[in-house]
Amino acid sequence: MTSWAAIFLLIAMHTILSGAEIIRAENTNASPTNQRRAHGNACGPASLLNAFHYGSKRWQRAFNAVPGDDSKTRINYVISRWGLKPSKHIEGVRRWNQQGINLVDLQDVANEMCDYHWLPKIKYEVLTRAPDEAATTLLQRSHQRIVKSLKKGLPPILCIRRYAYRNSKELKTKSWWPISAHFIVIIETTTTLKNSPNSYRIKYVDSYGGHTHEGTIHTSSGSFTNSPFLGASLPSATIGNTLIKKGEATTLTFSAVLGRW
């Protein structure tokens, strides 16, 4: 999907949502944690802090227990306390390193942060279409996860990946390859898909810069034919932009969610 198409889709969604019911994170007065104050690849730890901070009072306990008065101090504490532990899923590596952190290790960090405060377990789900599943069904499933987590007081964390259509030396042909991934936190969406079965609007916190933005999750995969993922139109996102080669087709996908349901 082109940037202009993404903008037009976002404008259209604003029109559709004029009468739609919205669900929001409980603590909308929270200030975003900015990963760039600490490490450029700290979106995982920063997103956990944002999810807990924007959540209900009981989830805020996990944020308030992290010492520090600024993004850098809090992020570094989360990394040193929980992120530098050995991964339970990949032998010989730490949970967080210079490449960032993966989804399952991030879940482990989240639950260890919660254990101290008697908070319920946080789950994750990789969102791919089953062989006979329609894209609209996957969209509905993803939306249900987001809404349920918001209702339970925890803004969910989404994994967004940028794919690029490029040559493979091994396969000697062009195919779609993931070139970058990023975590964002959803703080607002519609309660149902009744008026828009192919997309839903989101308001999210982007820890890369510490800002809130708007976008849409949709069933269109553009030129990424047979994509198993949902598409993401995030006009303000810079995910993987520096890795795109000149003239290369790229697209953003929504591949997984971390939350409470």
Regions found by a protein language model. Give the residues of each.
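Short, well-ordered loop/turn elements at secondary-structure boundaries
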Residues: 37, 151-154, 198
